[in-house]
Amino acid sequence: MKKQAELYRGKAKTVYSTDNPDLLVLEFRNDTSAGDGARIEQFDRKGMVNNKFNHFIMSKLAEAGIPTQMEALLSDTECLVKKLDMVPVECVVRNRAAGSLVKRLGIEEGIELNPPLFDLFLKNDAMHDPMVNDSYCETFGWVSKENLARMRELTYKANDVLKKLFDDAGLILVDFKLEFGLFKGEVVLGDEFSPDGSRLWDKNTLDKMDKDRFRQSLGGLIEAYEEVAHRLGVKLD
């Protein structure tokens, strides 16, 4: 497998083609963004931590029967993934109230949500990822009813797997987002799972161990990411 041209450069990752039309190289950079890319800073080791963290989580989800795009870890900051036809809608599961939900409904941060909430957002930075629903997806042809149902099913299944994984590590999985795509007609989990796209709190102190440390200028971002990885048993070095 040979890495070729840069195809896409996002806020924190770069995608490259390979000599295999079904495979891509996903590179995790040290960039960290907030406000849909309005604020960007670089943190040493972040690309490495997120790459290895993502590979670890995707492996756990694959073991649980969730199809993922992950193929192999290539280096400290790169992994080999299937080339997906990405769905332009992301799935969010909320186990506790935080972030935009608190602002939107005026509820207390941290209250438990039982059953968990499931939200859909259109992936569009310029419009700040507006919330949408099943009806929008059908009307605008973003994803079929069948594939959306499968995305919802896999998201809830991932939540069951990951809640226990993090709980066993002394962490609360507050919420997270997942992105899906199609590979040869099958719904497959793509993009990444890392503290960039999830909220993780310490069970005892409720300290935030995710990108909210950057969003809210709390400091200690990489230290928190590495602590989460350490608790899970992710091998970083």
UniProtKB/Swiss-Prot annotation:
<dbReference type="InterPro" id="IPR050089">
    <property type="entry name" value="SAICAR_synthetase"/>
</dbReference>
<dbReference type="InterPro" id="IPR033934">
    <property type="entry name" value="SAICAR_synt_PurC"/>
</dbReference>
<keyword id="KW-0067">ATP-binding</keyword>
<dbReference type="InterPro" id="IPR018236">
    <property type="entry name" value="SAICAR_synthetase_CS"/>
</dbReference>
<dbReference type="Pfam" id="PF01259">
    <property type="entry name" value="SAICAR_synt"/>
</dbReference>
<dbReference type="GO" id="GO:0006189">
    <property type="term" value="P:'de novo' IMP biosynthetic process"/>
</dbReference>
<dbReference type="GO" id="GO:0005524">
    <property type="term" value="F:ATP binding"/>
</dbReference>
<protein>
    <recommendedName>
        <fullName>Phosphoribosylaminoimidazole-succinocarboxamide synthase</fullName>
        <ecNumber>6.3.2.6</ecNumber>
    </recommendedName>
</protein>
<keyword id="KW-0436">Ligase</keyword>
<comment type="pathway">
    <text>Purine metabolism; IMP biosynthesis via de novo pathway; 5-amino-1-(5-phospho-D-ribosyl)imidazole-4-carboxamide from 5-amino-1-(5-phospho-D-ribosyl)imidazole-4-carboxylate: step 1/2.</text>
</comment>
<dbReference type="InterPro" id="IPR028923">
    <property type="entry name" value="SAICAR_synt/ADE2_N"/>
</dbReference>
<keyword id="KW-0658">Purine biosynthesis</keyword>
<dbReference type="GO" id="GO:0009236">
    <property type="term" value="P:cobalamin biosynthetic process"/>
</dbReference>
<keyword id="KW-0547">Nucleotide-binding</keyword>
<dbReference type="InterPro" id="IPR001636">
    <property type="entry name" value="SAICAR_synth"/>
</dbReference>
<comment type="similarity">
    <text>Belongs to the SAICAR synthetase family.</text>
</comment>
<dbReference type="GO" id="GO:0005829">
    <property type="term" value="C:cytosol"/>
</dbReference>
<dbReference type="GO" id="GO:0004639">
    <property type="term" value="F:phosphoribosylaminoimidazolesuccinocarboxamide synthase activity"/>
</dbReference>
